[in-house]
Amino acid sequence: MKKTALLAALCSVVSLSSCCRIVDCCFEDPCAPIKCSPCESKKREVNGGCNSCNGYVPSCKPCGGELDHETKQGPQARGIQADGRCRQ
């Protein structure tokens, strides 16, 4: 019984941390791929549900590989179009 409770507690902590990482990479990074969906990631349960965003790691460069972001300000400097969509 104690092992079951400990395992359940551990899984909830892992799920919570996975959830935070999903929010970080899916919603804060405008360049996250379309397939990077928290719901789909949870449905797949890859590696026990611990593989947030299917292994996607947010990049620190603008979408489209542009390097001349010194001249741009605000969201456009991060590769976001004026209407909020990520530049492809």
From Swiss-Prot:
GO molecular function: extracellular matrix structural constituent
Topology in membrane: Lipid-anchor
Subcellular location, record wording: Cell outer membrane
Residues anchoring lipid (S-diacylglycerol cysteine): C19
Keywords: Cell outer membrane, Cell shape, Disulfide bond, Lipoprotein, Membrane, Palmitate, Signal
Pfam families for the chain: Chlam_OMP3
Keyword DNA repair: no
GO biological process: regulation of cell shape
Recorded superkingdom: Bacteria
Signal peptide span: 1-18
Residues where lipid is bound covalently (N-palmitoyl cysteine): C19
Assembly and interaction partners: Part of a disulfide cross-linked outer membrane complex (COMC) composed of the major outer membrane porin (MOMP), the small cysteine-rich protein (OmcA) and the large cysteine-rich periplasmic protein (OmcB).
The protein's name in its UniProt record: Small cysteine-rich outer membrane protein OmcA
Species: Chlamydia muridarum (strain MoPn / Nigg)
